UniProtKB/Swiss-Prot annotation:
Catalytic activity from the UniProt record: pyridoxamine 5'-phosphate + O2 + H2O = pyridoxal 5'-phosphate + H2O2 + NH4(+); pyridoxine 5'-phosphate + O2 = pyridoxal 5'-phosphate + H2O2
Subunit architecture: Homodimer.
NCBIfam families cross-referenced by the UniProt entry: pdxH, PRK05679.1
Protein name per UniProt: Pyridoxine/pyridoxamine 5'-phosphate oxidase
Length: 217
């Protein structure tokens, strides 16, 4: 960074004027409100509305984040898929505590979730794997996620090789590919407001139900 031509970002800001979130807008079950917001994100044609930041912690206590696509949600939690040799999967084996974050900037909204990750069954993984486009199934075989490689050509050559190999018939599920369901412990809904007096509501698991609290911005 040039000392004589510093890129000043301190004054980059905008006003949040898309309305508020009031207690009367809330649902008893947070997944109902999540679904409403997700549908509105899709209707607004946001790019990748199911993209979420997944945060895990390694054995040294160092947090790590990456963007992953949400593929399913229900009363049992939020579901995503990954290579089981990836950094995230290894970290979840050591510490299944996890957080998810949906940044719907264009709607001045965020949803933050904390919980515990549980491995999906082989049947659940297989069902989803075979619903994916064929090239995506092949790519799962090609990439040993997070492994160091010297050139992109290695991936492309392997992809073409496996595309020929799997030209006919069903592509088998790799043993190193799976998924997780995140059981929900807290879920926070954030709505941007004027003068930075944002609306925040926190749902916290309370037995079979949810405790709901408004948080100061």
């Amino acid at each position: 960074m040039s000392e004589n031509n510093e890129f000043d970002i301190a004054d980059l800001r905008r006003d949040y004027v898309r309305g508020g979130l009031r207690r009367r807008d809330l649902t008893t079950n947070p997944l109902d409100l999540f679904e409403r917001w997700l549908r509105q994100a899709c209707d607004a044609r946001l790019a990748d509305p199911t993209a979420m930041c997944v945060a895990t912690v390694d054995k040294s206590g160092q947090p790590h984040q990456r963007i992953v696509l949400l593929k399913h949600y229900d009363a049992q939690g939020m579901v995503f898929y990954t290579n089981l040799g990836s950094n995230k999967a290894q970290q979840l084996e050591e510490n299944p505590r996890i957080s998810l974050h949906f940044p719907w900037h264009m709607l001045d909204r965020q949803v933050s979730i904390t919980g515990t990750a549980h491995r999906l069954t082989a049947l659940e993984v297989m069902k989803y794997f075979h619903s994916r486009p064929k090239d995506s199934q092949i790519a799962a075989w090609v990439s040993h996620q997070s492994a160091r490689i010297s050139t992109r050509g290695i991936l492309e050559s392997k992809f073409l090789e496996l595309k020929q190999k799997f030209l006919q018939g069903e592509i088998p599920l790799p043993s190193f590919w799976g998924g997780y369901r995140v059981s929900l412990e807290t879920i926070e809904f954030w709505q941007g407001r004027e003068s930075r007096l944002h609306d925040r509501f926190l749902y916290q698991r309370d037995g079979d139900g949810w405790q709901i609290d408004r948080l100061a911005p």
